[in-house]
Regions:
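Conserved alpha/beta enzyme-core scaffold
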Residues: 1-520
Length: 520
């Protein structure tokens, strides 16, 4: 069945998942539903501690069994040890048919691929995957489906009861023996625990895992003792050098600097750039450079930002230090400066639900003026792909891309015209993750395209000295350099589903097959 972005979703996938096809961003606007809730154990007669000896003991006490869904967060990013530790123990216990529901999975989790191959893990729900897990899914080694959701979409799936987490494992930099969790204060600081908050709220059992046990009470708690069943102390929950990567450095790449300058000039010439505007940007080189150059213009024109949102890096936190922004709203910290900034009284942690959930009564993304994003591919319909590489292998994550693009008044995607020898601007993206109706502007090193849906922006920019082109012109320039690329060759089997943030199906990912050259 064709959906609103022209993708044909197989009937068997609709039947298997019980889903509808994507009908557009506002299809569920005004929808009412009753939220799901977890099983909760009353603790009245307590010995005053929830400490258990090991992850094994926690699994036993939680009643681990075949077919369960286990929840994880990714605040430790490429330094995470939690997923591998837990799944190693699950594997030793002979448990099978596990669904992993993670906020994201990366190269740090390559070690679980054998557990995918032997059936310990049969389904994955995540924002996306990188590394060997993506390769395993794309080559058909996962027996079930990989369902990719945005950060807001994961919260929606959990709170509606579509996904029921049996046991959530929350890695926490500090914790007391009664389960009060904080993202700061230990040797593995990650700043905030925003993605894990929904796990704490809705999982039937919650296990806090820490490498820094502190005296009770560990307040103010980011995740409360009232949500936690057991606490495990281990030697290390992650590699601090890979959790936060130091100060995010401005790029010296001239192409990225050019795109950053285009982006800044577009922002400051738009109708939304005025005192009290709001802003979110990413962690890429061009995005960081655009934030730095924007700060200079803000200072020159005496314009203040009301709030910044993130995924935060040093340049955004510098705005707070320099009194150029009233406050920061934080869901994830990408460098040490952002982790340290959490201590600032105007640096507020927010949950993933507050940030981007489309099924609550209004999330932060709906208040954004600007969001600056990246993409692997953008097509002539302004659809974006941020999950599947040019070789057809799953190699990225939706993150907050669809959420912020849908919510912001002006969503800007920065992408080089060519990724190596592969056109990033193309006729049709390999896989749609963010629909073109959400994307307002595409900035490349060869020019800027404004979505024809946004005639107001086109009118506002008519006298601005920037290299504007149509998206088709950008595609044609790319193809004139590289030629039109051969389409990725997929098999018939669907191995992954790309969910829209509202839970409808945006696209599917099929198993790849070896490339075959067409005969003349």
């Amino acid at each position: 069945m064709l959906n609103a972005v022209g993708r044909d979703i197989p009937e068997e996938i609709l039947e298997l998942t019980g889903k509808e096809v994507f009908h557009g961003n506002h299809y569920y606007d005004g929808y009412e539903y009753k939220k799901d809730g977890p099983k909760t154990k009353c603790v009245i007669n307590s010995n005053g501690s929830k400490l258990v000896d090991s992850i094994h003991d926690a699994l036993v006490k939680c009643g681990i069994k075949d077919g369960m869904t286990l929840g994880f967060h990714h605040h430790f990013r490429e330094g995470d040890y939690i997923v591998n530790m837990v799944m190693e123990e699950v594997h030793k216990m002979g448990i099978k048919d596990i669904t992993i529901c993670a906020s994201s999975l990366g190269k740090a989790h390559d070690a679980i691929v054998p557990y995918i191959e032997d059936g310990t893990i049969t389904n994955i729900q995540s924002s996306g995957v990188r590394g060997k897990i993506g390769e395993a899914i794309s080559t058909g080694k996962l027996k079930g489906l990989a369902i990719m959701r945005s950060h807001g979409g994961r919260v929606r799936a959990i709170e509606t009861g579509e996904t029921r987490i049996d046991i959530a494992f929350i890695g926490t930099p500090t914790c007391d023996d009664y389960g009060n969790c904080r993202g700061i204060g230990g040797k593995s600081d990650c700043g905030v625990l925003s993605y894990a908050m929904v796990d704490g709220d809705y999982a039937d059992k919650v296990v806090a895992i820490t490498d820094c046990l502190v005296p009770f009470p560990n307040f103010p708690a980011h995740i409360s003792m009232t949500k936690v069943d057991y606490v495990v102390e281990v030697d290390a929950i992650g590699d601090p050098k890979k959790i936060a990567t130091g100060a995010a450095k401005p790029t010296t790449d001239q192409r990225k600097l050019m795109m950053a300058e285009y982006c800044t000039q577009f922002v400051v010439n738009s109708p939304y750039f005025k005192d009290g505007f709001s802003y979110q940007t990413g962690v890429g080189g061009a995005s960081i450079a655009s934030t730095i150059s924007l700060a200079k213009i803000m200072k020159e024109r005496n314009i203040r930002m009301r709030f910044g949102v993130g995924g935060l890096t040093k340049p955004m936190c510098d705005l707070l230090i320099n009194n150029q922004v009233d406050c920061l709203l934080d869901t994830q910290d990408f460098d040490l400066s952002a982790v340290e900034s959490v201590k600032n009284l105007k640096h507020f942690r927010i949950s993933a639900g507050e940030y981007a959930d489309p099924f609550n009564k209004g999330a932060v993304v709906n208040k954004l003026d600007f969001v600056i994003l990246a993409a692997l591919e953008v097509d002539v319909h302004f659809n974006c792909n941020v999950v599947v590489g040019s070789d057809g292998v799953i190699t990225g994550a939706q993150g907050g891309h669809p959420d912020t693009a849908a919510g912001a008044k002006c969503s800007i995607v920065i992408a080089p015209l060519l990724q190596g020898r592969i056109p990033a601007i193309c006729t049709d993206v390999t896989t749609v993750t963010t629909p073109g109706e959400s994307v307002d502007v595409v900035i490349t090193d060869y020019g800027i395209a404004i979505n024809p849906r946004r005639q107001d922006l086109i009118e506002a920019m008519k006298d601005v000295d920037l290299p504007f082109k149509t998206i088709e012109e950008l595609r044609d320039i790319a193809y004139s350099i590289t030629g039109e690329p051969e389409k990725v060759q997929f098999g018939d089997r669907v191995v992954g589903v790309i969910e829209s943030r509202d839970g409808t199906i945006m696209d599917v990912v099929r198993e790849i097959k070896p490339f075959e050259f067409a005969e003349d």
